[in-house]
Amino acid sequence: MLIEVQGLSKRYRPRGPMVVVEVSFSIDRGETLAIFGDSGSGKSTIGQILAGIYPATAGEVRLDGQRLSYPLRGPARRRIQILFQHPEVTFNPKLRLIDSMREPYRLFHLPYTRQGLCEYLERYGIYEEHLDRFPAELSGGELQRLALARAMLMDPSFLVLDEPTSMLDVISQAQVIQLLQEIQQEREVGYLLISHDRALCERFCTAIRPLEGGRLGEPV
């Protein structure tokens, strides 16, 4: 099993309310699990715990059977990536995009050439002229596709999709979903989709589980 989550719970402050309560699920390679719920239900918190943004209060996460420790380090840091609802948070607003896109190469000692990066980005509909711009100069759809390309540079086996299309227009939504489906078919990446959009969950996912009050329901 690619990802196994057991008894995951989270509170943000001592003696504060539990926002995630004993959540358990598993996702295998090539599968997409949707956690579906209203705003404030705790669904984004689950995804952000898995991606290493927040520590869990209780419970454990296993990747290929190995219990993860947080903050994520070494291979696990590459193998688990996240795509945010607001893609601009992925990029430093003061840096040109070429500099932000070079960062994974530096962190993980990957061979870099500008030409190689440009060729890689073409499948995401991003071209060389985009790279000399700042994040605010791209559309939401362009920036989300670039964020996806940046995540996939790390060659992850698991991707958290935290409302990745909710801020996009219909055409951009379709482009991002198509890219995600193609990537999954090619690489057998496992996805956790966090969404309030039931129609998207039904169209895109292997299984759907509702979340209410931090508690995960049975598949629907």
Explain the meaning of each model-derived region.
Residues 134-138, 142:
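Conserved ABC ATPase signature
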Residues 51:
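Helix-to-loop junction immediately C-terminal to a conserved catalytic motif
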Residues 36-38:
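The feature captures the beta-strand-to-loop junction immediately N-terminal to the Walker
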Residues 114-129:
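Conserved ABC ATPase "signature" region
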Residues 67-81, 95, 99, 107:
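ABC ATPase NBD coupling module
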Residues 1-5, 9-22, 70-72, 94:
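A short, flexible loop at the N-terminus of ABC-type nucleotide-binding domains that lies
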Residues 148:
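Hydrophobic anchor residue at the start of the ABC signature
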